Curated annotation (Swiss-Prot):
ATP-binding keyword on record: no
Catalysed reaction, written as an equation: a (3S)-3-hydroxyacyl-CoA + NAD(+) = a 3-oxoacyl-CoA + NADH + H(+); a (3S)-3-hydroxyacyl-CoA = a (2E)-enoyl-CoA + H2O; a 4-saturated-(3S)-3-hydroxyacyl-CoA = a (3E)-enoyl-CoA + H2O; (3S)-3-hydroxybutanoyl-CoA = (3R)-3-hydroxybutanoyl-CoA
Protein name: Fatty acid oxidation complex subunit alpha
The gene coding this protein: fadB
Annotated CDD domains: crotonase-like (cd06558)
Residues bound to substrate: D296, N500, Y660
Source organism phylogeny: Bacteria, Pseudomonadati, Pseudomonadota, Gammaproteobacteria, Vibrionales
Record-annotated active site: H450
Keyword S-adenosyl-L-methionine recorded: no
Organism: Photobacterium profundum (strain SS9)
Amino acid sequence: MIYQGETLSVRYLDDGIAELNLNAPGAVNKFDLKTLECLNEALNALYQQSDLKGLLITSDKDAFIVGADITEFLGLFAKPAEELSQWLTRANDIFNKLEDLPVPTLSAINGHALGGGCECVLATDFRLADITARIGLPETRLGIMPGFGGTVRLPRLLGADSAMEIITAGKDKKAQDALKLGLVDAVVAPTALKDAALSMIKDAIAGKLDWQKRRAQKKAPLTLNKIEATMSFTMAKAMVAQVAGKHYPAPMTAVIAIEAAARMSRDEALVVENKHFITLAKTDVAQSLVGIFLNDQYIKGKAKKAAKEGQPTKKGVVLGAGIMGGGIAYQSALKGVPVLMKDIAVPSLDLGMAEAAKLLNKQLERGRIDGVKMAKVLSGITPSLHYAGAEDADIVVEAVVENPKIKAAVLAEVESNVSDTTVIASNTSTIPINLLAQSLKRPENFCGMHFFNPVHRMPLVEIIRGEHTSEETISRVVAYAAKMGKSPIVVNDCPGFFVNRVLFPYFAGFSLLLRDGADFTQVDKVMEKQFGWPMGPAYLLDVVGIDTAHHAQAVMAEGFPDRMGKNYKDAVDVMFEQQRFGQKNGNGFFAYSVDRRGKPKKNVDPAVAELLAPVLGAATDFTSDEIIARMMIPMINEVVRCLEECIIATPAEADMALVYGLGFPPFRGGVFRYIDTLGLAEYVAMADKFAHLGAVYEVPTGLREKAAKGESYYTQQVNA
């Protein structure tokens, strides 16, 4: 044994060939601070070996290295820039030490080699992958860029264009694609990886493979003439500007760093990478995107825990076919849980099966599934007019029409047709779970399961706990939602649950702006282009459906009359009266036509201004900051109230529900990350300026107290 550390070891195999084996405690290998130090110590030991002829790097895990330990990021990013620079320099000194070993080096890659894992294999002379390998640099998706030499070595290995595509997209490459690009030298079967790696390193030792030429290429400037460089970097910047936009600076910064270092040697180029990495690490965007990653891991961790605690779902029932029921049935069957889809009408069952078939055909066309998988999924959905077969179901998801009396009747009926241990969940967006539970004999087996439309695309599922819901029920439904590929977030029962409860104060802010003379097209433009929502409020209302929103607003007003009741007629009322229901019937705040791909196309409708004139104030030119403040303060206040009232358990879950359920701009991180970034005292001062507008603008007491104490909602990281 040459070296034995906590996360890796080095030993001789035969004839002067050493193996550096990555085998950290836990499920995966990460390039955390500890592993970097172990690598440094291992390399120091290797430099002392006079008999060393070659080095293989291997992994004992299913994945080579999944990347850096992102839980360390926020702590590192909070350090002074000089200290962060020193850490990066030290890390790169270690990778340079690997690259500069006086013998040929080879990485034998199995599974994922991402981020720091990819940068590690780039530092070796050769890369051999098995067919399961996926290699990439996802850092730009976290608001940063590669910092362990990725922007230096990858362009010198692949050429600037291919390297910039990989780095700016942040997506990994399958083994065969990596081979075509030249990112790996060969791809073999998993069982052949070790022997093939030994054979290749022996060829390098024997001089059959020129490892020194390979190494020299990675340490030299890029081989681009001035005209080629100008064309390459100009096109890359134009593409990145179009795709990433102004709110996500990391991809553009990576391109700028590669361009600035193009004519430099490795060591000079690493200094450039260091500087640009630090610039990004200090941005609010990086804090937000890293925070989202950590929050997502926290939610996944809770779902895994629930899966261990609750019995697995082997069979489900969906009550109510149609688009929503068909979508739920499809998602369940796709992920391996067969379902009985029950309805009272054959046309509805046909519609549900057609919805599932349509979604599967899209997957087939895109090459994501084959015909065998499609047939298997469809055979996993059994349409039925009867309850026969439901008696052994683990979970029932009721998805009938959004009417409390109908739902209550259906729930009582299904309860009498299933076992005493079957969990029943209602897919409802507005009806209180405690109200529906009154129709059941076993309310402890009942909860809400609010899917978002379209089911196959929207990641969030709200799991609603009623007064009598057992923890066993919650665990089983959370585990089922996770099995379906969703992000389940548990909330307590209240009008609108969490997502709709916080959405309608936002719509109230919109109505008040219009009442005070704002132009709804300007409001939409500001909230999309400046704040970063995928849709402005008018467009969102059209997509949700004006009739749906009008009904939900009445429910919210009944539940929270002080804040959400209104004593004036607003723009949504006018749209509803005029039966302009939005995209569903072609007219709402905007008019809709069908584009060449069959998708709704939004158009300005001149008739709307005249229709709204009676409820609009005198035209007023609001600044972008005023529009953002007046739109966001009501939502922020309601989100905080939900936390204070224990409707939602943590800031992390609240922020992820907003990002996954409403499309809250990821670069802002969610409401709690956003107000932490603003500063709670600054937020309170801003909100107080608008307090005269009504109760939705009044800052919750708990938030005001935290602001006075100088506190924030997040510490540096969320622990799963």
